[in-house]
From Swiss-Prot:
DNA-binding feature ranges: 273-306
GO molecular function annotation: DNA binding
Domain of life: Bacteria
Organism: Mycobacterium bovis (strain BCG / Tokyo 172 / ATCC 35737 / TMC 1019)
Listed name of the protein: Probable cell division protein WhiA
Length: 325
């Protein structure tokens, strides 16, 4: 689904000048580099979609007044797909300084510039958008689903992890076969980050496929149950997970950490027994401790829902939900 995300992001209209600058800086940092050609600094970026190259060329001209040239490298031999190389030669050094790729002394900045790292939330979203357009990937929902960005170095990876943290998304920097990557694996976090970047339509498709896969996996497990008690237990687990998801939604940031942890375990491992959830907890807990925390989480959410006059956790346990289980 990588192309879907990039296509949607390349058409996104951004009004904030600061965010547009942050996106350009991030795109250049993650997709390109600085070269010295004939004693001059040349800014270059290699991209995999023509729409991204056109967006970057347009933004460089509108924001900085410099002309970028795009060269098309057709697929052939070792190149599996067409690539687009954007190059700013005549004003390369000026652009590099203005985007923060070079510091005041003319030295290359290894991570992301301070104005992006310490910018607004819009800037953090733009930094992720630029990085994803440059070198991002999104796999289909499943056991190994992930949103990933290949990074030019560990400093850039850490800057991206920090930007994700500011957006409320947990991301991890990893070195895989000598290459630095930033990875988001949690399904909810992937969905949230897609929306933050501006790929809401793709998120909806991704979430639908994720839900369909979960339902299919649950159905496959249930098909193997030959005991009515196991089937009832599975329905109870589906209902409990749905109630917990609703509870976390109702409480938002006000949910105590220890209750949130137990709730997330229930949601992430829908078919696991309380005993199994206890073993998965860090540190491990007894099944009674897990059950107690989930009970308190649901009770707290239901009380808040009553005060706020909104649907409580029981409202999501519909006949259709149980029938699908």
């Amino acid at each position: 689904m990588t192309t879907d995300v990039k296509d949607e992001l390349s058409r996104l209209v951004v009004k904030s000048v600061s965010a547009r600058r942050a996106e350009v800086t991030s795109l250049l940092r993650f997709a390109g580099g600085l070269h010295i050609v004939g004693g001059r600094v040349v800014v270059e970026a290699e991209l995999d979609l023509g729409s991204i190259a056109r967006r970057l060329r347009k933004e460089i001209f509108e924001l900085y007044g410099y002309t970028a040239v795009v060269h098309v490298l057709s697929a052939s031999g070792i190149r599996k797909s067409t690539r687009y190389v954007l190059r700013v030669a005549n004003d390369g050094e000026a652009l590099a300084r203005q985007t923060g790729l070079l510091d005041m002394r003319g030295r290359p900045v290894r991570g992301l510039p301070a104005q992006v790292v310490g910018g607004s939330i819009d800037d953090a979203e733009a930094a992720w958008r630029g990085a994803f357009l440059a070198h991002g990937s999104l796999t289909e929902p499943g056991r190994s689903s992930a949103l990933e960005v290949s990074c030019p170095g560990p400093e850039a990876a850490l800057a991206l992890v920090g930007a994700a943290r500011r957006l409320g998304v947990g991301a991890k920097a990893r070195e895989v076969r000598g290459a630095d990557r930033v990875v988001v694996r949690d399904g909810e976090a992937i969905g949230a980050l897609l929306t933050r970047m501006g790929a809401q339509d793709t998120r909806l498709v991704w979430e639908e496929r994720r839900l369909r896969r979960e339902v299919r996996a649950t159905a496959n497990r249930l098909a193997n149950f030959d005991d009515a008690n196991l089937r009832r237990s599975a329905r109870a687990a589906v209902a409990a997970a749905a109630r917990v998801e609703r509870a976390l939604e109702i409480l938002g940031d006000t949910v105590p950490e220890h209750l949130a942890s137990a709730g997330k375990l229930r949601v992430e491992h829908r078919q696991a027994s309380l005993e199994e959830l206890g073993r998965l907890a860090d540190p491990p807990m007894t099944k009674d401790a897990v059950a107690g925390r989930i009970r308190r989480l649901l009770s707290m959410a239901d009380r808040k829902a009553k005060v706020d006059g909104i649907p409580d956790t029981e409202s999501v346990v519909t006949p259709d939900l149980l029938e699908d289980a």
